[in-house]
Amino acid sequence: MIRKLSITLGRVLRPNDFLGRWRMGDEFIVVLPSTTIEQAVSVAERLRSSVESASKEWLYPTSVSIGIAHYPRHGNNAAALLEAAEYALIVSKQGGKNRVTVAP
C-alpha cells in the first residue's frame, strides 16, 4: 500500500520536488522548492485527488490529509516549518480527513 501511495504521489510532482517517508507510520513529506503558497495548495489538491482516484482500484480505498507550511511565512527554519505543517495536518484530520489545510 505504501509503495502504491508513493508512486501515485510521485506522478504529480515535478523532477525537482522532494517526496519522502516521514516518521514511522504512513506519513510522507513533500518539499516544493521555488513554489508560491497558491501553487503549493494546487499541488496538494492534485496529490489528494490523485490518491482518492487511484485508490478506488486498490484493496483498501485511501485518502490523504495534507498540512501546508510555506517559507518564510510560517517559519525560517526546518523545525518551525515542520511544526506549522504538523499543526495544519492535525486541523485537516480533525476536519474530517481527505483535506488540504494551510497553516495559520
What are these regions (language model features)?
Residues 30, 62-64:
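HATPase_c (GHKL) ATP-binding subdomain of two-component histidine kinases
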Residues 8-23, 55-59, 95-96:
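Nucleotide second-messenger and two-component phosphorelay signaling modules
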